[in-house]
Amino acid sequence: MTKSPSTLGILLFAATMIIFFVVYYFFSGVEYFDISLKANAFVLPIIYAGAAFWSVKTYWNNHKTVSFRDAFKRAFVPMFIGGVLSILSIYAFLNFVDTDAKKLLNYQYVTRQKSELDKEYTSARKILKHQKDIEELDQKYKERLQSFTPEAVKGKDMLTASHFSGYFAAILIFYVVLSLFFGAFFRTRTIYQETEIKE
């Protein structure tokens, strides 16, 4: 059964929000930011890529000829609709419904950045031999620490509209690249099969 790209987009939106709220309700503790990051980095790309593939494949199965444009559209439109609706909904939820969750994510983001800085500093200090290099490293570390003082992190917000726009721009690149791949792949296979039939 071939679903329209817009229908698949709505289904992707629903799947994204289910994952978002599962993480929100069951993992909104000390690991909330890390688990959210992993879900966005590993789970959602697989779901979106799978949906895009299924969208193009089912269309290809039901049509003798599939142009690059058709294949690209069948892959891109569902991901775009699902992504836009998800970004808007998550932004609205964190900024207007549960601002405490937003504060927690921002706090854990800063904490994670500080932890990574400490790890880099510790590992770098172990391998340095010359006192001059160690002193330079210590100085740079102290300078970087200033960005984590209470005054520096007060009001720091990584979940503003501009940040969400940036996130979506990065996601959009993923959608375009994946759609280009599916467009080229299915168009090539169609031409190849038609050539074989003519022979």
Regions found by a protein language model. Give the residues of each.
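Transmembrane alpha-helical insertion/packing segments
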Residues: 1-65
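Alpha-helical transmembrane segments of multipass membrane proteins
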Residues: 15-23, 48, 82-90, 174, ...
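Membrane-interfacial segments
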Residues: 26-31, 59-64, 93-101, 105, ...
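Hydrophobic secretory-pathway targeting helix
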Residues: 59-95
